[in-house]
Curated annotation (Swiss-Prot):
Gene Ontology cellular-component terms listed: cytosolic large ribosomal subunit
Organism: Sulfurisphaera tokodaii (strain DSM 16993 / JCM 10545 / NBRC 100140 / 7) (Sulfolobus tokodaii)
BP terms from Gene Ontology: translation
SUPFAM superfamilies given in the database record: Ribosomal protein L32e
Stored HAMAP family: Ribosomal_eL32 (MF_00810)
GO MF: structural constituent of ribosome
Chain's gene name: rpl32e
Keyword annotations of the record: Ribonucleoprotein, Ribosomal protein
Keyword GTP-binding: no
Keyword Cell inner membrane: no
SMART domains: Ribosomal_L32e
Family assignment from sequence similarity: Belongs to the eukaryotic ribosomal protein eL32 family.
Name under which the protein is recorded: Large ribosomal subunit protein eL32
Amino acid sequence: MNKQINIRKIQEKIKKIREKKIKFLRYDWDKFYRIGRQETWRKPKGIDNPVRLELKGYQPKVKIGFRSPREIRGLHPSGLIPFYVNNKKDLEKASQMKDKVIVVFSSTIGLKKKLELVEEAKKMGLKIANG
């Protein structure tokens, strides 16, 4: 019972923080088609760039203060730790920590092997993120 309350608190905290999370876009991403395709952050380096100068009314510049809290960093939205699996040996390791982890199958696994691992994980009672 206590574990569920703890996980629920973590889930609520994750939800609140991810709602507030700012999406850092490249300066002028909306003005040019080729830049608009690159919606990833690039450090502004121009001499008069308002983002670099951190002028009011422009998008925020990436800073260390925007980082998510350590206790929720890297967690799955369910509040569990993602555990990447490539083979049955990894599944056995995950089953030892099944209260804390959620299984994520590696993208390099083929369909046949993935189906076998999904079946095995269900027998072990593991939670699966992408099965």
